[in-house]
Amino acid sequence: MLEGFGEALADREYYLPLPSVADPGPRFAPGEVPPGLSGAAQGIWTVWGGPRTGFAEQGWKIHVSARLDRAQHVLDTVAGICFSEGVPFKHLSARLFFLFLHHKHAGRAQAGKFCAVYPPDTATARRLLERLRDALDGEEGPYVLSDRRYRDSRTVHYRYGSFGGRGRLRADGTREGLVRDGSGREVVDLRLPAFHLPAGIVDPFVEQEEQPHAGPILIRDYEVTRAVRLSNAGGAYQARDRRTGRPVFVKEARAHNGLVFDGTDA
């Protein structure tokens, strides 16, 4: 991500925290909210909880992606399910924040995330994954690089990690999250643009773990030899045409991501 990218969007003359922007555009909010529940602003997010809800320290976090033009419908669906289950969740608060998180130059590990759901245990996570998958069948959204897609869903993803309660300060003053691995040791909660499990944690939502890729990386007839640049819009690669042996340049475009500020994707 470009340093200061979010701060540059908040004001025409000064660097300011992005959430302080005067006009973030149309707001996102659930269409129906049960009595007694209210949302709380947390940076660019709105967090929803209630008397029956509470955040576990860590677990299977669910991320739901959406196309910008379908975001309100997706939010209403996610909110309805979470309210009925009494599970806390959050969503991006406004259109500008959606465009920022999905922009070409935003952080790749965070891109694609529109809603985040925090189930208290694995059984609840499994039930929510199934309900969300069924309710959002037919919806499209960007692939969340830090996560694994749930079955054949195009919008529902999950990863194992901290729910935000445990962390420590680095020497440079920034904070890093911590999570307990399978043996109970505290380790860094790695938020990478690739799916990662702490040692000793097993994915309960797949019948068999996929084997790491071995051999050349192929895009049709082109064998990738080097990544030149990676962004939310897609990658740029040096490659070799396997039919002729000629060196070529391949540019990738990621669907529903790499947005510009009129909402056009890569």
Where are the regions a protein language model picked out?
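Nucleic acid-processing catalytic cores of prokaryotic defense/repair systems
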Residues: 44, 51-75, 91-110
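ATP-binding glycine-rich loop module of kinase domains
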Residues: 54-71, 221-266
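Short amphipathic alpha-helices in soluble, non-transmembrane regions
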Residues: 77-78, 128-136
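A common structural junction motif
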Residues: 82-86, 133-144
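Juxta-kinase regulatory segment immediately upstream of eukaryotic protein kinase catalytic domains
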Residues: 1-26, 167-227
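Elongated alpha-helical scaffolds
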Residues: 108-115, 119, 123-130
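Short proline/glycine- and acidic-rich turn/helix-capping motifs at secondary-structure junctions
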Residues: 96-102, 145-168
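A conserved alpha-helical element in kinase catalytic cores
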Residues: 68-91, 103-104, 124-125, 254-266
